[in-house]
Amino acid sequence: MKLIIKNLKKNFEKKEVLKDINFEFEKGKIYGLLGRNGAGKTTFFNCLNEDLEIDNGEFYIEDNGKTRKIQPEDIGYVLSIPNVPEFLTGREFLKFFIEINKDKIKEIKTIDEYFDFMKIKKEDRDKLLKDYSHGMKNKMQMLVNIIASPSILLLDEPLTSFDVVVAEEMRV
């Protein structure tokens, strides 16, 4: 499987942010985007995730010689600023996420097994997400993407707010 990007272009008014991006991402490989603040890395992700309308170009998946349009379930996205339902507890959020995605999840584990995997302490599991730290919210965001197991996982500076132990484990 490959994610193919052809002639991607994005402008904000007169400022050209993405100019004729052409690239193929192969399954099983990890790619990194390097650049200064404002270079267009997050804009690139937002275009790919269809959160921003592109000015030109196309992206699609090629699998076994066949091409198809990217579907929303193909992409998981871990934002640099966590986006979680703060009115739920961590446990309620995972339970809800698993329930609405149960037909798509390949191997469902217990909620506590997921918490253990991300090193979320027992005393934090039933706290409201609004009371989680930035790093804890990021863990939850990463966890639902691990559970969903999308074909494409976009990580926008995901490890910056993780504690050192979890960040190192995620790199492995």
Locations of regions flagged by a protein language model:
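Q-loop/switch helix immediately C-terminal to the Walker
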Residues: 81, 86-102
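Conserved ABC ATPase "signature" region
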Residues: 95, 106-124
